[in-house]
Amino acid sequence: MHGAQIDISITAQLAEITRVADCVESFGRNQRVPSHAVNDMNVVLDEIISNIVRYGGESARAHPIEIRLGRTGDRFSAEVRDRGIPFDPVAHVIPPPRPDRQKTPGNLGILFVRALMDEVRYKRENETNVLLVAKTAAGLGTLEVPPFGIETTRPDAQSALVALRGVLVGTTHTKLREQLRTLIDSGVVNIIVDLAETARIASSGFLVLFRTRRRLDELGGRLVLCNPQPVVRTLFEISGLLGEFTFAPDRDAALQALRKPLDPLPA
């Protein structure tokens, strides 16, 4: 069966993730790929490209990353080729999660790749990493992702409400990180992050939230997340971090959660 495909060539830079995401969304719209499959593919490609840029070495940065998107029937796929050091995410052994809530989690990207895709295959060919990821995408659909934005309000001197819009990924997480740092430096110790308009979160975004929660713990404050969309909540479940955060169904409940006495941190 013949299908549709497009080829994308990018330099090994994190800034290119935005262009890839735009191509995936455009291809998805043209091919009527269901929105959940487009979202999952963009999370996975964010993780793959970020890993190549950060850990692929000089050989990866000296050559383009080649991506082929395709849809054949219900199969939505991406093949990624890079010249970085060999790395097989299929064979990589992920250690068990650490029970210490203050330690930064690792291997989130590999977890997302394995969990979100129905097929993950790797081979090394002519000094090139070739990674194929594919997802069954039955049916038709469209996806509209709002542009990234952060809106902040201050209920009181020590609290802030941060509403996120769009995607929290490799190219946008630094904006949230700097905004949260600025709030904490100004004396804020309680932060609500509203995820109602957040379409997806990659591992870089999870780490910003985790480190913020850890910092607020140290200050005797609290981070509360509210209104997560089902796809975002699923990513928290996959990451194993669902129990590391306080969740609320809406802003009012989040404000009430901030007023509850804090449990003492384990010694």
Segments predicted by a language model, with ranges:
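Conserved beta-strand-loop-beta-strand hairpin that lines the nucleotide-binding pocket
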Residues: M1-D7, I52-E144, I238, F245
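Helix-loop-beta hinge of the Bergerat
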Residues: G3-S35, L180
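STAS-typified acidic loop motif
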Residues: D7-R19, P147-E178, L195-A199
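Conserved short strand/loop->alpha-helix "switch" segment adjacent to the catalytic nucleotide/phosphoryl-transfer site
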Residues: D22-D46, R101-P105
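Conserved catalytic core of two-component sensor histidine kinases
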Residues: V38, N42, R114, R177, ...
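Amphipathic alpha-helical interaction surfaces in cytosolic regulatory modules
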Residues: I49, R83, V167-F245
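Conserved beta-strand core positions
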Residues: H63-I65, F76, L131, F148, ...
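A charged, well-structured terminal subsegment
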Residues: F247-A267
